[in-house]
């Protein structure tokens, strides 16, 4: 049998057998006196006196009635089959009594002094695990003495009657035992389950006198060697109870004692003696070193040691959190069930009652009273930490038993509370996922749930918590007024329950997250609130409980009557918000007892904000709350940092603090700063090569992804549009010496070479506004000095290579750290003003050449002029193929104005649409990113549809040819083409080379600095020295071939990095997006540059683009560049009252007049640069721009304090990847 006892014929239950004691040799008087005292104290007669008076019957409390079904269940239940007490007796070699010695006599006296209950006060308790106060070492010494000084037992005289002794819990004698199992005789009458207060128990047992005579008769049987035994010998290790076929079975006591106790007491004894309930605080009892499993031989300890080795180490490492609040509600059929009403990943999301959909994530606002009630609830409720259960019924069973032990609920409410905890769970997404056919989860009655799912106790996998269907009788009604409660569906963990899970929500939950389930509700059968906080030993997947399959680690249960003042909903929100707080849930993982949880609540209250109970009208009144909260969080982090430093001081790390160190407690290893000087010539360049080139194979492998293909198509249009725009304007500025063809070829060649050799291949090289301004200034200078413009650029390029080599050799890239936003804003604001001015100046020239006249030339004259210089649809021929375009054309000015404004407004509207709330985030982002190509395409179609109005078109040659073949070729002679180039200019070209180096250095290095921000999570590093050397050296080659100089384009480079950025999907709703990785590779840059170069074959298409459309793009770039500059925002504050100023650091931390003074200084620098740019000395404007750097670091600290400069000139811009956030123009202080 499973119980290890051979049943007699007929299937009767075994009856314990008792042997007749043998006659013992006379002992000393002291020993006999002690034996007599203990015999009187623990005699059977005292038990008879205790049970002779039955407890009074209370007629008000209902008693349970038992039927034949109850008795049959009791007879055939395995855990009610009791073993004979003789089976717990020690082996035969322990039957010998030791003679008294002086040492033993002294130890007996010492043990008698430790006895807490005198014999006259009552019956001593039966110890759970070893006798209280018994010293382990003394017992081992007694064993050794007993084996060395044992005397043979003499048989009693034949004529003397046997002396019956029956003492329980003897502290003196070693317990005798039997060499084998007791023989089975007749079955013991079974006792049905009953409660302590049932009046039926009085007739179930014989009288004390009859019981005593029966026991005496049993003890007089000849096969009993001794009647003196010790209850301590019945102790066995808890791990030995898990073996179904082992000698140690789950039997709480023997039949004799079972007849004295009720079924409730037997169940309690069984739970107390045989189960190990984690989280339940018990009195510490010193365990004796002797156990029955290891008494006979060392092999008995092997199973115990094996199980100890298999015990897993507690996982105290905090995980990410997912909290779900379930409230007890009634459905449409008035059936109770658990309904999900809120959830937390980081912020709170509530279910809207009317629409049954999730609301927007928000910061949870809690009432101060609910937090105090929660603290009081945890202080007085049940706290089960490190509970070793893996099923919901097992957890619920131990929670209910703990509530009963802590006097939170009555024993008769056990069934109702357990049924309530096991009710089915429903979620808002259940009906949505199932469509027209709602999902019907598997349900079962209480009997099937408890019969099929036995929670596993901590002492062994095979030992199950005793569950018995009839222990609860017929299923008690969950609600007292509901007679059909037994048919209500309960939670069935094993069913198919996750059909309605939300995959989108599951993506937002981190992979290693562990869930917290909060169950709160009102029940009518409780008289007072009952609560329990449970932390499982390890996270387990409780199916059908959560909306998504996330393992559960914490549970909080709160049930109570409705007539109390407790708001269960707010209390559930409070504990859920606490568990979603980072510091509190870390403390919950590391808590050792209840006090740690209470301390964590106090820490949470220290960082909380209390808002007065007044009506708040408008968000402006709550502006101070956010700032105050940031201050509290800062102080909280400082306290945590101080604690971490104290725990790590001296090399000691407190237990449970390893994660805090990983999260920022310990300093990270210093990173390889690419701008750090080595002190050697070309030292920075060598470090860049060693840092970046080892990643070259991965730069090719990482491009094998579909995201790279999408990035290539997007950045191609983003790079082609500026190339066409700046190429057309450059042709206007240089009179056709350089145009679209040269700029496209330069972008393609330099882009491919830089992508293959550069240290940061994510940079996009291209033409920019500052270089356009410089080219125009240098062209005017050469015309004024009667010099060849292209030949002068050759010498400027050669000097540029020399200066770049000298700068890289001296590791001068570190100077970029001194270029603050003060200089960047001046630079960007100046270029934006130039763009806007040039746009309207070009439009003014169109109105001058084609004025609005009341009378135009005759039709024939107009046709003759059109035939002389126009292609069909009014496309202007290249300068070599005919005269300049016609003048005084009707409607040309108006159409040019419409095309320019139409292009600007379409591109600007699509940019605003990108940050709007229409459509999805990805769709808006795609439309917004392609705003410029879309606007160009739309307005080209508009111009193409109007055939009778002339507009000036973009000049693009046919095939791979220069813009003006009659003026130049692809190679520029360094000594001059038409006439010799003056030698003095060969040397003087060093000055413009130095100026163009300033522009290239500032744009390239600032762009590389922006791309290399830590927030962008680039892992392969960058190389400022190598990138500058490549761009400068390639600039020298551009001069020889008559190609425009290029630099790292800020907006296009940042857009390229953003297109290759992979965002984390496991982001809590309402939280800002986080970068998972960036696909750093070289292939996309090569493909983008190649596609731009191949665009030269689209000459027929490019010749259809009107110049007015390019003016609109020029205007768009100028206006959008101003939106991200703090200078433009502070400029508007001059015209705004102080009460309407925004809550920005440069407003709140600086006085208004001093803020305006800083703005005026910047405007003065811009005005000076504009004046220089407008005069003949326009070539020197990069040098004046460079002078703003020493102005910021030398003069401004004398006018402003450090804290003011920190607020006015701080680089606090971070990359924004929110779908509803700002674009690249708002993040950057650099010109387009």
UniProtKB/Swiss-Prot annotation:
Residues 1-708, 911-925 are cytoplasmic. The keyword Transcription regulation does not apply. Residues 58-75, 267-279, 481-499 have a biased composition (Basic and acidic residues). GO terms for molecular function: chloride:bicarbonate antiporter activity. Residues 134-152 have a biased composition (Acidic residues). It is found in: Cell membrane. It is a multi-pass membrane protein. Residues 1-11 have a biased composition (Pro residues). One of its GO terms (biological process) is pH reduction. Residues 76-97, 104-113, 280-289, 305-316 have a biased composition (Basic residues). This is Anion exchange protein 3.
